C-alpha cells in the first residue's frame, strides 16, 4: 500500500507517539470485564442486537456447562496455543486481553474465547488498528507507536527489536483475535 498516506491518515487520529488521540477517542487504561472490546477505542462498529444469541452456540454458557468436549459447535483454543500467543516478554507484563478474553471450560487443555460475551456490536475500525498502521508505516517512530499501545494493554515497553514488522504482527494476532483484520496483515 501507500505507506506515507496511511501514516498521515493514522496520525490525524493518533497524533505523534506518546500523545493522546483526538477526542472523543481514548486508549484503555485498565482491564474491565464490562469493556472487553475497549469501547473507548472503537472508531466504527455495527450494532448487532442478537449478537449474544448468535455467538452462544459457539462460546456461550450452555456450551461451557455442557462441556466443550460434548459439543459439536463449541469453538475453543488450546491452552498451549493461547500461552504461545500471549507469551510474556517481560516479567511485568499483565496483558489485559489475556485477562479478559478467555473463559475456562471443563477441558484441561482448552479455553473458549470470551471476547464477545455480553457485547452488542461488531468492531470495524479500532484506535489500536491506527497505532499498528502508524507503527508499520513509520521507520523512525514505529517502535514508539507500538510501545504507546503496549502501555495501554498492560505490557512493558520494548527497548529494541530486531524485526519490528514481526512484533507488529504478533500484536495484531492478539488484538484482533476472532476478527477479520488479520487478513490485512497477509502482505507482511
Place the predicted regions along the sequence by residue.
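Acidic/polar-rich alpha-helix caps and helix-coil junctions
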Residues: 1-63, 67-72, 77, 83-186
Amino acid at each position: 500500500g501507500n505507506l506515507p498516506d496511511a501514516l498521515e491518515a493514522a496520525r490525524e487520529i493518533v497524533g505523534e507517539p506518546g500523545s493522546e488521540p483526538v477526542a472523543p477517542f481514548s486508549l484503555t487504561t485498565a482491564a474491565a470485564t464490562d469493556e472487553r472490546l475497549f469501547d473507548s477505542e472503537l472508531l466504527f462498529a455495527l450494532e448487532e442486537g442478537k449478537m449474544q444469541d448468535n455467538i452462544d452456540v459457539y462460546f456461550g454458557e450452555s456450551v461451557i456447562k455442557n462441556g466443550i468436549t460434548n459439543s459439536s459447535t463449541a469453538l475453543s483454543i488450546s491452552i498451549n496455543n493461547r500461552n504461545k500467543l500471549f507469551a510474556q516478554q517481560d516479567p511485568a507484563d499483565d496483558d489485559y486481553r489475556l485477562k479478559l478474553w478467555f473463559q475456562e471450560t471443563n477441558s484441561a487443555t482448552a479455553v473458549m474465547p470470551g471476547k464477545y460475551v455480553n457485547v452488542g456490536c461488531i468492531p470495524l475500525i479500532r484506535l489500536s488498528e491506527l497505532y499498528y498502521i502508524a507503527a508499520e508505516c513509520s521507520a523512525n517512530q514505529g517502535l514508539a507507536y507500538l510501545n504507546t499501545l503496549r502501555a495501554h494493554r498492560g505490557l512493558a515497553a520494548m527497548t529494541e527489536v530486531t524485526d519490528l514488522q514481526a512484533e507488529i504482527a504478533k500484536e495484531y494476532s492478539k488484538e484482533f483475535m476472532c476478527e477479520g483484520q488479520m487478513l490485512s496483515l497477509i502482505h507482511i
